[in-house]
């Protein structure tokens, strides 16, 4: 085999096929919180289809279910817990005044 044909041959590497994130028996519904919470980031954002490894139809149904759950207050729109956390080492003394006599 000459050199020009050899460059186009692909190496045959084996790969493990991942399980689909949604099985055929799972119902995509706004009440199914255990299923919906797998497709939301820590900040509360809907993860993309590439990250979720979903089909187009599944991603659309998941997005609709998440939005319905948000409207019905089952899910938060944003999850900003880190913003409100305070470190224990720094005491809060901004409002205290000491009188000097």
Swiss-Prot record:
The gene is rps18. InterPro entries: Ribosomal_bS18, Ribosomal_bS18_CS, Ribosomal_bS18_sf. PROSITE patterns: RIBOSOMAL_S18. One of its GO terms (cellular component) is chloroplast. GO terms for molecular function: small ribosomal subunit rRNA binding; structural constituent of ribosome. Keywords: Chloroplast, Plastid, Ribonucleoprotein, Ribosomal protein, RNA-binding, rRNA-binding. It comes from the Eukaryota. Transmembrane segments: none annotated. This is Small ribosomal subunit protein bS18c. GO terms for biological process: translation. Part of the 30S ribosomal subunit. SUPFAM superfamilies: Ribosomal protein S18. Gene3D superfamilies: Ribosomal protein S18 (4.10.640.10). Belongs to the bacterial ribosomal protein bS18 family. It holds the Pfam family Ribosomal_S18.
């Amino acid at each position: 085999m000459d050199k020009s044909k050899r460059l186009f041959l692909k190496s045959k590497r084996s790969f493990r096929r991942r399980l689909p994130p949604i099985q055929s028996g799972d119902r995509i519904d706004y009440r199914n919180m255990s299923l919906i919470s797998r497709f939301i980031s820590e900040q509360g954002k809907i993860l993309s289809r590439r990250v979720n490894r979903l089909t187009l139809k599944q991603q659309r149904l998941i997005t609709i279910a998440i939005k319905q759950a948000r409207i019905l207050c089952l899910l938060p729109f944003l999850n900003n817990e880190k913003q409100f956390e305070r470190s224990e080492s720094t005491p809060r003394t901004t409002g205290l005044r000491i009188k000097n006599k």
